[in-house]
Amino acid sequence: QFQITSNVLSGLTHIDAELVARGDLAESWEVTDDGKEYTFKLREGVTFHDGADFTAEDVVFSFERAKSETSAMKELLTSIVEIRAVDDHTVEFVTDGPNPILPNNFTNLFIMDKGWTEANNTVNVQDFEGGEITYATTNANGTGPYVLQSRAPDVKTVMVKNDNYWGIDQFPMDVTEIVY
């Protein structure tokens, strides 16, 4: 599942070959001296696969969704007490205390298009353990290097190269199709 998700959706950060958190959808971030506030500057000009602009509102929405009671990712975010969009390309996270691994935790949290998610009735996190299938189980609208072309869970997944990927110059992509 992670291999599929991480090729279609992107997070604020990723772990590089030296196991250091680096910016993905975030260009940079700063932490206050007391370690309680993180300010992330987002990449400008990034679009979702359907052409919608990626903004700070998508980040706030995705993290609030990930903090929800039914989310399997909520434990990674327990120290966050507030998330706010400062402007279209800046997000602030306020924590209950210093959390030096927070940028590392963000590598496991993928940003969803708020508008797409609302339009497709997938705002609530699906019940994986209960076997729930939602529109987001078989469809996606991400910012990642590959576009989900088709998905039949536990049968076959096809992804094709995203020619509009923001990082295409930094990460040459020779593979045009991935089939699981």
Range-by-range predicted roles:
Residues 1-33, 64, 141:
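N-terminal lobe/hinge region of extracytoplasmic solute-binding protein
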Residues 1-3, 25-27, 52, 102-114, ...:
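A structural "hinge/loop" feature
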Residues 13-17, 34, 47, 59, ...:
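Sec-exported extracytoplasmic/periplasmic mature domains
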Residues 16-20, 109-170:
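Gly/Pro-rich hinge or "lid" segments in bacterial periplasmic/extracellular proteins
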Residues 27-72, 86, 92, 178:
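Aromatic- and charge-enriched surface segment that lines or borders ligand/interaction sites
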Residues 35, 78, 141, 177-180:
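Short helix-initiation/N-cap motifs at beta->coil->alpha
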Residues 41, 75-125, 150-152:
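Surface-exposed binding/hinge segments that line
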Residues 43, 65, 162-180:
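Ligand-site clamp/hinge motif
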